[in-house]
């Protein structure tokens, strides 16, 4: 095996199938690029990202693990978020939750 190589069965791979999602329009109002990783609690992202923040509570980007989305200054884009799963406890990030999601 080559480092980073993936061997998978043929066919379609479904990520986060059947999980609750929300779609938001997000704009970078700052003067620096902002990159958000796949498992970052989107509600707690940089304040320069303008969007309906309360709708992102308990959600992360609906993208493959280990990837990210970059928002250039002045850029707006539509993103799909997926509900966090497991224990639904959030610690760290920007420190806005620090416990169980409500």
Swiss-Prot record:
InterPro entries: Urease_beta-like, Urease_betasu_sf, Urease_subunit. GO terms for cellular component: urease complex. It comes from Methylobacillus flagellatus (strain ATCC 51484 / DSM 6875 / VKM B-1610 / KT). It catalyses: urea + 2 H2O + H(+) = hydrogencarbonate + 2 NH4(+). Pfam families: Urease_beta (PF00699). This is Urease subunit beta. Gene3D superfamilies: Urease, beta subunit (2.10.150.10). Its EC number is 3.5.1.5. Pathway: Nitrogen metabolism; urea degradation; CO(2) and NH(3) from urea (urease route): step 1/1. The keyword Methyltransferase does not apply. Heterotrimer of UreA (gamma), UreB (beta) and UreC (alpha) subunits. Three heterotrimers associate to form the active enzyme. GO terms for molecular function: urease activity. The keyword Cytoplasm applies. One of its GO terms (biological process) is urea catabolic process. It is an enzyme of class 3 (hydrolase). Belongs to the urease beta subunit family. It is found in: Cytoplasm. Its main location: cytoplasm. Keywords: Cytoplasm, Hydrolase.
């Amino acid at each position: 095996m080559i480092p980073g190589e993936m061997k998978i069965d043929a066919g379609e791979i479904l990520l986060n199938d059947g999980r609750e999602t929300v779609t938001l329009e997000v704009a970078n109002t700052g003067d620096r690029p902002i990159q958000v990783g796949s498992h970052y609690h989107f509600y707690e992202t940089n304040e320069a990202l303008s969007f309906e923040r309360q709708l992102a509570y308990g959600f992360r980007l609906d993208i493959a693990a280990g990837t990210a989305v970059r928002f250039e200054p002045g850029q707006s884009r539509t993103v799909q978020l997926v509900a966090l799963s497991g224990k639904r406890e959030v610690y760290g990030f920007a420190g806005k939750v620090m416990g169980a999601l409500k």
